[in-house]
Design a protein with these regions (language model features):
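PLP-dependent aminotransferase class I/II
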Residues: 73, 251-328, 332-335
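Cationic, low-complexity basic patches in intrinsically disordered or flexible, solvent-exposed regions
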Residues: 3, 17-19
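N-terminal small-domain helix-loop-helix segment of the aminotransferase-like
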Residues: 29-128, 135
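Conserved core of the PLP fold type I
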Residues: 89-220, 231-249, 253
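Conserved PLP-binding catalytic core of the aspartate aminotransferase-like
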Residues: 316-317, 321, 325-360, 377
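Short Gly/Ser/Thr- and Asp/Glu-enriched loop/turn motifs at secondary-structure junctions
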Residues: 58, 120, 335-341, 368-372
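PLP-dependent enzyme catalytic core of the Aspartate aminotransferase-like
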Residues: 10, 21-29, 352-360, 365-403
Length: 403
């Protein structure tokens, strides 16, 4: 039992019942809250692992998980609430298992964003792009199959592969965190992976891929090529989306999310665009009624109000570009960013800097290669707080020369 302050205390019932009698086996067993995970018969490959997740602290400035810092307007929140109230009257029935209305809206949005006509049958949706990517690995990965990613990469790729028993191979990016096209092509030709992960913009570096790089990989990859575009709406002018390659690429899957630019992280909706046959394949592993009626309804309202939901994207892009310039002026190594975050370094002791910022009430992320940190782009006031906290922290731990 947990007290209000989070300290464990034993209830009177537990004090009197340290052991419970198992009537089926005739043996005494420990009370259910008197065991740890080490006492459970979990799979051997899980015993040394920790659950994935970013640190969570209640601080004034949270710039660690790449959320949109701007809330939906009150009028939009009221519209969502009204829609959910109407939907609740039918909550006794299962939702549309294929989320056809939501997928049609997502297809319409992709056409608006990229200029490519996408049909609802070319879109699949899930509880965040994490679920969609997991489903893709369940279909195209698995025991005896392999995947390939460039590093540094989104840590969840390793999780998707681990939980689907897919072997993950990696190859390094360049010193400036760009994709090495020649190395990517030669590695694919040598390993013949079933799945290739590409990320544009890349997390944690923020760097985007040229369409020519994606096309080169599509030309040699024997299996599926996934382009993770979680941050696509933040790309700079002239950076094209991989969605534009879909009409001529049967084995290309482009994943996106409403969690970032759409300021809908709490709604947990992600999606992918691909050939209709790929959608049919994903349906083979989806759980029944995986998207609740409330999720579908709220996300549909968000998409119907896309102009308002995306209204601060240009503001965040401008703040990002100012942050990149400011950090470079201080002497940091900062890759170009097409996302709503910036990676910067290098520090002899990045954890010390991270800790100093946290003491100042600013939470960022220890992400990327050793010596680097990542900051999400917040409001103007939040970024002012970040700059002040970083300058203060640098007095005690200056950056390491990149030479």
């Amino acid at each position: 039992v947990q007290s209000e302050k989070g300290r464990s205390r034993r209830s009177p019932w537990n004090a009197q019942h340290q052991l419970a009698f198992n009537t089926r086996s005739g043996r005494m067993q420990q009370a259910w809250d008197d065991i740890s995970i080490a006492d459970l018969p979990i799979r051997e490959d899980l015993k040394s692992l920790r659950a994935y997740g970013a640190p969570q602290f209640d601080v004034p400035v949270r710039l660690n998980v790449n959320e949109n810092p701007y809330r939906p307007s009150q009028s939009l929140a009221d519209r969502i609430a009204q829609t959910l109230s109407e939907v609740a009257m039918h909550a006794n029935r299962y939702p549309d298992r294929d989320a056809t209305g939501l997928r049609a809206r997502l297809a319409d949005y992709l056409a608006h964003d990229t200029g490519v006509i996408v049909d609802a049958g070319n879109v699949w949706a899930g509880n965040g792009s994490n679920e969609v990517l997991q489903q893709i690995l369940q279909v195209f990965g698995g025991p005896g199959r392999t995947a390939l990613a460039s590093t540094p990469a989104y840590p969840m790729y390793d999780e998707y592969c681990r939980t689907t028993f897919t072997r993950l191979h990696t190859f390094p990016r360049t010193e400036t965190f760009e994709l090495d096209r020649d190395l990517a092509v030669s590695t694919i030709q040598a390993l013949q992976p079933d799945v290739v992960f590409l990320t544009s913009p890349n997390n944690p570096t923020g760097t985007a891929l040229a369409l020519s790089d994606i096309q080169a990989i599509l030309g040699v990859a024997p299996g599926m090529v996934i382009v993770d575009e979680a941050y696509a709406e933040f790309r700079r002018h002239g950076v094209a989306s991989a969605v534009t390659l879909l009409p001529g690429s049967q084995r290309l899957i482009v994943t996106r999310t409403l969690s970032k630019a759409f300021k809908f992280a709490g709604g947990r909706v992600g999606y992918c665009a691909c050939a209709a046959a790929v959608v049919d394949a994903i349906k083979l592993v989806r759980l029944p009624y995986h998207l609740s009626v409330f999720t579908q309804a709220a996300a549909s309202v968000a998409l119907d109000c896309r102009d308002e939901m995306l209204s601060q994207v240009e503001l965040l892009k401008a703040e990002r570009d100012r942050t990149v310039s400011w950090l470079r002026d201080l002497g940091f190594d900062v890759p170009d960013s097409d996302a709503n975050f910036v990676m910067f370094g290098r520090f002899e002791d990045r954890h010390r800097i991270w800790t100093e910022l946290l003491r100042s009430g600013v939470l960022i992320r220890e992400a990327g290669p050793q010596g680097y940190l990542r900051v999400s782009i917040g409001t103007a006031d939040e970024m002012t707080a970040f700059r002040g906290a970083l300058l203060s922290a640098m007095d005690t731990c200056p950056p390491r020369s990149s030479s």
